[in-house]
Design a protein with these regions (language model features):
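Receiver (REC) domain switch/active-site residues of two-component response regulators
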Residues: 130
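N-terminal pre-triad scaffold of radical SAM enzymes
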Residues: 2-29
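Flexible, glycine-rich phosphate/dinucleotide-binding loops
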Residues: 12, 108, 165
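Short, conserved loop/helix-junction motifs that constitute active-site signature segments
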Residues: 124-127, 150
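Glycine-rich nucleotide phosphate-binding loop and flanking beta-alpha elements
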Residues: 75, 139-140
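P-loop/Walker A phosphate-binding loop and immediately adjacent motor/lid segment at beta-alpha junctions
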Residues: 86-91, 142-173
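Conserved Radical SAM active-site core
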Residues: 1-4, 17, 35-115, 119-120, ...
Length: 173
C-alpha cells in the first residue's frame, strides 16, 4: 500500500486534534473528489514499518484525540489488508484514542458478501473503528454546513453504538 500524506495536528477530519493518514488507491472516482491524485494505487510513498512507527509517535501526545484514515479509499481490499495489522497496533497502544475512517462505500456495501470492498479483513477492521463516515461524495448534495463530511448522503456512523444495538446509530458530537 502507498499513502499520499500523513497530516499531524489535523482538525478537519474528526473531533479534536488528530493524525490523519491519506492512503492511495480508490476505484470509486467520485466526481469533484478533493484528492483525485490519490485514486492511483502507486501514488505517494510506500507504507512501511517506519511509516507505522512515525504515526504511532505522532499519536502519543495526550492532546492528540486519535487517528483518521482516509484517501484514496481505506476500504479497497488491498488497503484493508495492510491497514488491519496497523490499526490493531494503534488500538493496542492507544485504547482511549478514537479511530475514524472515511469511505466512499456505504456501510451496507462493506457488510455485503460478494461486494467489491468486502474481504477477509473487513469485519475485523470495522470492529476496531469508532466512527465510519460512509458514502460517496455527491456534488449535487454538497452541504458545507455539515461537520466532517461534504455531502448530505454521507453518514457519520457511531460503530460502537451500532455494535451494541445491532442497528446503525449515527454519531453526534
Amino acid at each position: 500500500m502507498n499513502y499520499a500524506v500523513i497530516k499531524n495536528c489535523d482538525i478537519a477530519n474528526g473531533p479534536g486534534v488528530r493524525v490523519s493518514l491519506f492512503v492511495s488507491g480508490c476505484t470509486n472516482h467520485c466526481e469533484h473528489c478533493f484528492q483525485p491524485q490519490t485514486w492511483a494505487f502507486d501514488y505517494g510513498e510506500p507504507f512501511t514499518p517506519q511509516t507505522e512507527q512515525t504515526i504511532l509517535e505522532l499519536l502519543s501526545p495526550d492532546y492528540i484525540n486519535g487517528l483518521t484514515l482516509l484517501g484514496g479509499e481505506p476500504f479497497e481490499p488491498e488497503n484493508q489488508r495492510v491497514l488491519l495489522p496497523f490499526v490493531r497496533r494503534v488500538r493496542a497502544a492507544f485504547p482511549r484514542k478514537t479511530i475514524w475512517c472515511f469511505t466512499g462505500f456505504t456501510y451496507d456495501e462493506l457488510l455485503t458478501e460478494g461486494s467489491h470492498p468486502r474481504c477477509e479483513a473487513t469485519d475485523e477492521l470495522l470492529s476496531l473503528l469508532d466512527v465510519l463516515v460512509d458514502g460517496r461524495y455527491v456534488e449535487e448534495l454538497k452541504d458545507i454546513s455539515l461537520r466532517f463530511r461534504g455531502s448530505s448522503n454521507q453518514r457519520l456512523i457511531d460503530l460502537n453504538a451500532t455494535r451494541q444495538t445491532g442497528s446503525v446509530q449515527l454519531f453526534s458530537s
